Amino acid sequence: HRTVISSYSQAVVFDKKTIIIGERINPTGKSKFKQALRDHNLEYILREGVTQQDNGADVLDVNVGLPEIDEPSMMEDVVKELQAVIDLPLQLDTSSAEAMERGLRVYNGKPLINSVNGKKEVMEQIFPLVAKYGGVVVGLCLDEDGIPETAEGRIAVGKKIIDTAAAYGIGPEDIILDGLCMTVSSDSQGAIVTLETLRKIRDEL
């Protein structure tokens, strides 16, 4: 079984090749982008997408979350319009289940879904959407207790995500686990724990 996402015309296989995900369609720290969202300036947003495709991105992240806008409606509009000007697969990036469903409903292909985690409430919101519309879901190795400090703890959360997904008919090939990387300033062992988590994901899950 291979882990594959697609647009209407192009597939991206997650194997040994590094996959470049363009992250410019995201309001975090971008005042012009935030204003474009407030103004419903799709032309500005689409230009960000085209530029990233031209510069070698394999996948485009789409995050239009801003408290003062209608995120579900904006997600639907941006996903629709982006597909008309680029042929890269998209990663739908939102913490809103409603916005996620609006994007999935109009997406032509099999997207990357960002994200779920080990929290029961989050899995109960997102996995039914993945089962209904299809997609490869990013699973963050954290849960109600936060980010585990050890690789073993993160693997336990990863296993919980995989097992819960299976109950919805979602196979492990449609889950990409994110082992999480803490900054060295906040945890001097952070990088070591992340590398050990990645090794265990490869060898045990």
Range-by-range predicted roles:
Residues 1-178, 182-205:
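Domain-level signal for soluble alpha/beta catalytic cores
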